[in-house]
């Protein structure tokens, strides 16, 4: 979470550049939009791809065409459900591949919070206040969620 106390985004671009030896990311998966998209445009590698998944920030980003041209990057809209409806065969192949990667432990969601259902109001409050990074899990029937097990 790179949100600063004043609500602005800071450090995201610098962290990506640091992790990539100054080159920038080859692919950025952006479900947030807004400031994250703006920063992503500035830390994407030459020829990279930004996958726009959604706008949970509440602000639709505007893509600066000059950066797209200069860096020769691609900004790609990704709607998994629609992709599967338009091309069911390819959609199933993609879904099967995601399941395979998850089963092999190569991808897993980051879960920052887990709550029993009795505390679901607290979970919703954290989501509303943007205090959750990744996912928040609500469990039922006394199930103990182990964040390390996924």
Regions found by a protein language model. Name each.
Residues 1-36, 90-93:
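Adenosine-nucleotide cofactor-binding segment
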Residues 24-25, 107, 120:
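Local beta-strand N-terminus motif with an aromatic residue
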Residues 35-106, 139-150:
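Glycine-rich phosphate-binding loop and adjacent beta-alpha segment
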Residues 61, 113-116:
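A structural signal for short, well-ordered beta-strand elements
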Residues 115-116, 136-141:
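Short-chain dehydrogenase/reductase
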Residues 129-134:
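Glycine/proline-rich active-site loop of Rossmann-fold NAD(P)-dependent oxidoreductases
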């Amino acid at each position: 979470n790179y949100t600063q106390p004043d609500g602005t985004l800071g450090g995201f671009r610098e962290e990506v550049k640091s992790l990539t030896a100054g080159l920038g990311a080859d692919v950025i998966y952006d479900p947030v939009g807004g400031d994250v998209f703006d920063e992503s445009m500035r830390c994407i590698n030459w020829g990279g791809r930004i996958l726009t998944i959604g706008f949970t920030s509440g602000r639709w980003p505007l893509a600066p065409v000059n950066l797209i041209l200069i860096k020769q990057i691609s900004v790609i809209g990704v709607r998994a459900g629609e992709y599967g409806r338009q091309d069911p065969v390819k959609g199933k192949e993609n879904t099967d591949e995601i399941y395979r990667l998850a089963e092999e432990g190569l991808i897993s969601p980051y879960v920052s919070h887990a709550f029993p259902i009795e505390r679901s109001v607290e979970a919703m409050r954290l989501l509303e206040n943007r205090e959750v990074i990744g996912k928040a899990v609500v469990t039922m029937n006394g199930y103990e969620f182990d964040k390390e097990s996924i």
